[in-house]
Amino acid sequence: MNILLVGSGGREHALAWKIAASPLVKRLVAAPGNPGMAEQCELRAVGPTDVPALVALAKEIAADLVVIGPESSVDAGLADQLQAEGIPCFGPTAGAGQLESSKAFTKAFADRYGLPTAAYRVCESAEAARAALELFEPPYVIKADGLAAGKGVTVAQDRGEAEAAIDDAFGGRFGAAGARVVVEEFLEGEIGSLFALCDGEASMLFGWAQDHKRVFDGEQGPNTGGMGTYSPAPVFTPELVEQVRTRLVEPAFAGIAADGSPYRGVLFVELMATKHGPKLVEFNVRFGDPECQVLMLRLESDLVPYLVACANGTLGDMPPPVWRDEAAVCVVIAAKGYPGTPAAGGEIRGLDQDLGDDVVVFHAGTKRDADGTLRAAGGRVLNVCARGADLRTARDRAYAAIERIEFADGFCRSDIGWRALGR
């Protein structure tokens, strides 16, 4: 098979690492990819939202499958155009992609199809959002409506902080994504990430993990795209998994199909496990980043047949995936200043050495100079991942590897996995 993988982050590097290991794959091309992905695939300098160029590239390499990594490609309508050209694609249409690209759409969708979620108000102005605060008790949750790279959510402890978040959104901090906001009820419980595949009709659960959104240890500081993950996560008891499947996953797939946009790809369900059962926090229409990294380390099965089955409508013929009876941890190394303005261009050394058993480093935001020097080129720069017999072993391996990487402008959290280890 010839496969085109779209994207350039740590999630896409993890997908490339797993896809390249498949005996079914003859040629793997990434667009645009990153320096780390060059070990697994050919790189082409085509951006993830340049739909005409991506379709042309898929035709050029005679792609048997296009795998869409980032949400920006979904929002740009890449899957729609590929389907129109008869090119098999793993990833939903832009219509189905509204489950991520608009918080207001998702809230209305949840109401329409009975998915449990937090009480909310959609606000078109700062004045309306400030008035909506009267409906809720602190902490307040303020969400930019559109795509904001995981940084558009503020959990405000008091009204002053909430009003500042509202002013930031309507003041242009998130561009068009902040043209309206959702003010919602704060949910008490433990958050988790669950993934499900769908081929337009049949669906299948595809792993779960737990993320760390806040930038600093102890869940302090602003939200990020994710500072680390681990899998399996003890919060996902068999009872909770079944509740998520029946109350969130299956109604979501049925609902989006009823709306005229059958879902093909992976759905990322971010949920809060409350005393009243799971409640939807948000949907994402792609693998989580960095959740994907730990799932790929734990996935024993060949990933490619599942991607193909989603694209071709044969998921119902596939067996459940097989997972390693091991834990996996991902620790994100970010550039200082993230999630604000990250330090750019810092030199990175030490990735060419043996970093230990079952350790894999995925590139997330890197570039390589003409002389081969590796440098930071983003907020989240590296994903240091490790497997182990248990969570503590995997975590220790990841942090031991980080100690051997030289990146003066980088930082990471030191407490990834604290919820599970503290049980």
Curated annotation (Swiss-Prot):
Residues annotated as domain ATP-grasp: 107-312
SUPFAM superfamilies xref list: Glutathione synthetase ATP-binding domain-like, PreATP-grasp domain, Rudiment single hybrid motif
Primary gene name: purD
Cofactor dependency: Mg(2+); Mn(2+)
GO BP annotations listed: 'de novo' IMP biosynthetic process; purine nucleobase biosynthetic process
UniProt-annotated binding residues for Mg(2+) 1: E270, E282
Pathway of action: Purine metabolism; IMP biosynthesis via de novo pathway; N(1)-(5-phospho-D-ribosyl)glycinamide from 5-phospho-alpha-D-ribose 1-diphosphate: step 2/2
Pfam families, alphabetized: GARS_A, GARS_C, GARS_N
Keyword Magnesium: yes
EC number: 6.3.4.13
Taxonomic superkingdom: Bacteria
Binding site for ATP: 133-193
Binding site for Mn(2+) 2: E282, N284
Binding site for Mn(2+) 1: E270, E282
Reaction catalyzed: 5-phospho-beta-D-ribosylamine + glycine + ATP = N(1)-(5-phospho-beta-D-ribosyl)glycinamide + ADP + phosphate + H(+)
Organism the protein comes from: Phenylobacterium zucineum (strain HLK1)
Family: Belongs to the GARS family.
Alphabetically ordered keywords of this record: ATP-binding, Ligase, Magnesium, Manganese, Metal-binding, Nucleotide-binding, Purine biosynthesis
Positions annotated to bind Mg(2+) 2: E282, N284
An MF annotation (GO) of this entry: phosphoribosylamine-glycine ligase activity
Cofactor notes: Binds 2 magnesium or manganese ions per subunit.
Protein's UniProt name: Phosphoribosylamine--glycine ligase
Broadest EC class assigned to this enzyme: ligase
